[in-house]
A protein has these predicted regions:
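Acidic, metal-coordinating catalytic segment for phosphate/diphosphate chemistry
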Residues: 1-23
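Short connector loops at helix/strand junctions that flank enzyme active sites
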Residues: 19, 39-41, 46, 73, ...
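Short, well-ordered beta-strand micro-motif
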Residues: 26, 103-107, 124
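Conserved Nudix-box catalytic region and its N-terminal flanking loop in Nudix hydrolases
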Residues: 28-68
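Nudix hydrolase/Nudix homology domain
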Residues: 42-43, 112-156
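A short coil-to-beta-strand element that immediately follows conserved catalytic motifs
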Residues: 72-81
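Active-site-adjacent beta-strand/loop module that shapes the phosphate/pyrophosphate-binding cleft
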Residues: 83-112
Length: 156
């Protein structure tokens, strides 16, 4: 079994963990958004992952972006704080995690783009190309909030 994201699914298993996480929306100078195709569920996704003991959430998003993309980034603003109890992630080991993620808009400051052991592919997409991609609804929501350029982060 692979990782399964449940979103507004009445048949989803009940969450048994809650772990802070961060994701990065990395846009290039053309306004294209960086996504990687995950090896655990084949979805296109934003770079990101869980917080480790001893780091703050800013360090989490920088580390995860580096690990998953090869790029060095600088967080610029918070796009949103996502904690919907109707979004749970089911893992093969029996863990069912309630989402709790802070999404950051990030600027590239260095590094070289590459895939990681967590992805099949990585590339920039123009916003109008995103609808055709195999992507979880929660990723679409984060990108939509980013493209709205709101002064206030989404909280929900």
């Amino acid at each position: 079994m692979q990782r399964i994201d449940h979103f507004n699914d009445p048949n989803a298993p009940r969450a048994n963990t809650l772990i802070p996480a961060a994701s990065a929306i990395i846009a290039n100078e053309h306004g294209e958004i960086l996504l990687h195709q995950r090896s655990d569920n084949n979805f296109w996704a934003l770079p990101g992952g869980t917080m480790e003991i001893g780091e703050n959430i800013r360090q989490t998003v920088i580390r995860e972006a580096r690990e998953e993309t090869g790029l060095e980034v600088q967080p610029q603003r918070i796009v949103g704080i996502y904690s919907d109890p109707k979004h749970v992630i089911e893992y093969p080991d029996g863990e069912v995690r309630q989402e709790f993620s802070i999404c950051f808009a990030c600027r590239i400051v260095g590094g070289k783009l590459r895939t990681s052991d967590e992805s099949f592919a990585i590339r920039f997409f123009s916003p109008h190309d995103l609808e055709r991609l195999n992507m979880h609804e929660s990723t679409h929501i984060r990108i939509q909030h980013f493209l709205e350029h709101s002064q206030n982060p989404f909280i929900g």
